[in-house]
């Protein structure tokens, strides 16, 4: 049966550039990959055709020869012949990302995005731990004890994965490189060795405790130092306290994500604190004093001058939060709220009415001026 046109196979025009070729190939390769269509001979055949078409057209020299002579350019043995199975057979579906799309995922033919390196050494995974602290703890700082479930190096086999007294052996399939080449038409593709999964070694007699993994799960207790002045959303990194690496690989890191609980009285903005304090109408009018307990446990006196208005702020210098890793302190801002009296007695009502009758514009300049300006605006 005559071969299909390579451009038609990929669904692109004969003027398609490299970007268009790659985009079309990725879409079709994902659709027809044998691992997504197990047992489907037609999908496997289609996948091989797509592979062959792309490998030809992405190479400028091969593409030029194909454009001039068609399939005849490669019919005399040319650059190789199809090998048994070839392509990605035997590999997991993730191989398509590792072998074809490696450059997109930070990998490449010397390793992959999962941290595996030549010889099978693999970095352990990073871990995340969420911790909630109070504003007082953020103010003073603290040392917290936490328990984290993680994977640690197996003590029985020292991380080798092999039963004590035995050793892993060099993989016979890839000769220890962790990579193999598979023929596909007139080209070859390098991919992860399916026998050793890229480790370069195989274990014939695995460790009984870790079952050949080289690490076991355990809950560890760690001490975390939280400095004073720490802010909500801060991330603390504990290097090497993540999961143990595989086959001698380095451990991952543990990241502590801190959140500071809302406080009943104080709101925080950077190193400054804000607190709303309600005072009586008479205190606002006549003046007075009140005490505020700050986060450090001390009391600070606030003097309210006569005629204080709602929203007035008083600054208590140095009574805010510590500035992280500094000797400086933020400030505490007291914002005044004036409470209107409720459930008045008859006598209280009479006195307020009398006060209102004898009040002048000078007593309420803002409200008097506001209504005068409004009247002038609308009536002209």
Swiss-Prot record:
Annotated positions binding Zn(2+) 1: 154, 157, 207, 210
Gene Ontology MF annotations: ATP binding; heat shock protein binding; unfolded protein binding; zinc ion binding
ZnF CR-type: positions: 141-219
GO CC term, one of those recorded: cytoplasm
Keyword field: Chaperone, Cytoplasm, DNA replication, Metal-binding, Repeat, Stress response, Zinc, Zinc-finger
Cofactor needs: Zn(2+)
Cross-referenced InterPro entries: DnaJ, DnaJ_C, DnaJ_domain, DnaJ_domain_CS, HSP40/DnaJ_pept-bd, HSP_DnaJ_Cys-rich_dom, HSP_DnaJ_Cys-rich_dom_sf, J_dom_sf
CXXCXGXG motif repeats: 154-161, 171-178, 193-200, 207-214
Principal subcellular localisation of the protein: cytoplasm
Highest taxon above the source species: Bacteria
UniProt feature coiled coil, ranges: none
Domain J: 5-70
The keyword Zinc-finger is assigned to this record: yes
Compartmental location: Cytoplasm
Cofactor note: Binds 2 Zn(2+) ions per monomer.
GO biological process entries: chaperone cofactor-dependent protein refolding; DNA replication; protein refolding; response to heat
Family statement: Belongs to the DnaJ family.
NCBIfam families linked to this entry: DnaJ_bact (TIGR02349), PRK10767.1 (NF008035)
Domain text: The J domain is necessary and sufficient to stimulate DnaK ATPase activity. Zinc center 1 plays an important role in the autonomous, DnaK-independent chaperone activity of DnaJ. Zinc center 2 is essential for interaction with DnaK and for DnaJ activity.
Quaternary state and interactors: Homodimer.
Biological role: Participates actively in the response to hyperosmotic and heat shock by preventing the aggregation of stress-denatured proteins and by disaggregating proteins, also in an autonomous, DnaK-independent fashion. Unfolded proteins bind initially to DnaJ; upon interaction with the DnaJ-bound protein, DnaK hydrolyzes its bound ATP, resulting in the formation of a stable complex. GrpE releases ADP from DnaK; ATP binding to DnaK triggers the release of the substrate protein, thus completing the reaction cycle.
Protein name: Chaperone protein DnaJ
Organism: Allorhizobium ampelinum (strain ATCC BAA-846 / DSM 112012 / S4)
């Amino acid at each position: 049966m005559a071969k299909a046109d390579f451009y038609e196979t990929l669904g692109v025009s004969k003027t398609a550039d490299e970007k268009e070729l790659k985009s079309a190939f990725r879409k079709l390769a994902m659709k027809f990959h044998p691992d997504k269509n197990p047992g489907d001979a037609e999908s496997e055949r289609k996948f091989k055709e797509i592979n062959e078409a792309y490998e030809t057209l992405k190479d400028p020299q091969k593409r030029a020869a194909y454009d001039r002579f068609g399939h005849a350019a490669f019919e005399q043995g040319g650059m190789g012949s199809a090998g048994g199975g070839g392509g990605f057979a035997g590999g997991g579906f993730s191989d398509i990302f590792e072998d074809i799309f490696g450059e997109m995922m930070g990998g490449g033919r010397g390793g992959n995005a999962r941290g595996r390196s030549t010889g099978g050494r693999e970095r352990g995974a990073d871990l995340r731990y969420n911790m909630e602290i109070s504003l007082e703890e953020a103010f003073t700082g603290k040392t917290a004890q936490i328990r984290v479930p993680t994977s640690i190096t197996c003590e029985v086999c020292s991380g080798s994965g092999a039963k004590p007294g035995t050793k892993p052996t060099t993989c016979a399939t890839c000769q220890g490189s962790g990579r193999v080449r598979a023929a596909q038409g007139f080209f070859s593709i390098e991919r992860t060795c399916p026998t050793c999964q890229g480790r370069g070694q195989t274990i014939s007699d695995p460790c009984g405790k870790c079952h050949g993994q080289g690490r076991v799960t355990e809950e560890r207790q760690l001490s975390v130092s939280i400095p004073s002045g720490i802010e909500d959303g801060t991330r603390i990194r504990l290097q090497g306290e993540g999961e143990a690496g595989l086959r001698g690989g380095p451990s991952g890191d543990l990241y502590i994500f801190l959140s500071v609980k809302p406080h009943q009285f104080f709101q925080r903005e950077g190193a400054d604190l804000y607190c709303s304090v309600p005072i009586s109408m008479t205190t606002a009018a006549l003046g007075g004093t009140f005490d505020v307990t700050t986060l450090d446990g001390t009391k600070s006196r606030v003097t309210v001058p006569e005629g204080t208005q709602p929203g007035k702020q008083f600054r208590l210098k140095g009574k805010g939060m510590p500035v992280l890793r500094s000797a400086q302190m933020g400030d505490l801002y007291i914002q005044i709220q004036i409470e209107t009296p409720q459930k008045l007695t008859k006598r209280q009502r009479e006195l307020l009415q009398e006060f209102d009758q004898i009040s002048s514009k000078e007593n309420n300049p803002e409200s008097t001026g506001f209504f005068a300006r409004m009247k002038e605006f609308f009536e002209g």
